Amino acid sequence: MKMPLMMRMHRDFPPNAKVKQIGISCSHRKYFVSFSVEYEQDITIIKNPKNGVGLDLNVCDIACSCDINHHDKLTDFKQYQTDMKELLGIEIDEEVNTKRLIPTYSKLHSFKKYSKEYKRLQRKQSRRVLKSKQNKTKLGGNFYKTQKKLNQVFDKSSHQKTDRYHKITSELSKQFELIVVEDLQVKNMTKRAKLKNVKQKSGLNKAILNTSFYQIISFLDYKQQHNGKLLVKVPPQYTSKTCHCCGNINHKLKLNHRQYWCLECGYREHRDINAANNILSKGLSLRAGNVHARL
């Protein structure tokens, strides 16, 4: 029996689009319909290759090689500084050029998922499951009520993060014809530490996985293609340790050093912004046929 169903559309189809495939998915008793459509899009050659930006993806923020227009749309940076300090105890340097940093809020979203209340309910659920197995009884109604609360918190946090990444990537794709990112190998970045600092490394691994670098890059990839623009991936080696001015590599630079200071030429800059400048330079040199290119 065929029956009409009410649904809420996220956005209209592109003009002259043909629906090729329909997919139905269910997540925690919520149903979603996705449409695969085919339509024509004019792809124009990049007019101004210098209108590019290098992005250094980090756990707390995305560093850009140049200022971002309409930066206030993407974040309230003062509120971000307050939230990070009060909730996580992380202090953000006020002297940094904030128009080159876009907070991801990934730590704040994961904080909601792993808050004390959330963990308490998870432990409660585990005890209920263990008790039902020992007594060979069915799980009661309270178990499913609590699980529904946990699912709602997890879904809300996940949707907030995805929505934020969509807003960031859409604004970047709208402003820049060329976007250069690092070709990050998250699997290698999140390998377990050997012998020393195992606990510290596990915390860093969790933060990296919560940030979802691949999701950001995949959003940028398809949006750049849709807009007829270009996304370039470059090797990530020594982007943070190399001086953008003279090219000297500071091998003594550690992860907790947030300010880059070149011992050769005296150049000083925020560590991630220096890395973003190097990433853009690498991308421009690749497009120029491995010829050294600088801004």
Regions found by a protein language model. Give the residues of each.
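Short, hydrophobic/proline-enriched secondary-structure or compact coil segments at domain edges
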Residues: 1-2, 35
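Positively charged, helix-rich recognition surfaces that bind polyanionic ligands
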Residues: 15-295
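Beta-strand/loop nucleic-acid-binding surfaces
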Residues: 3-12
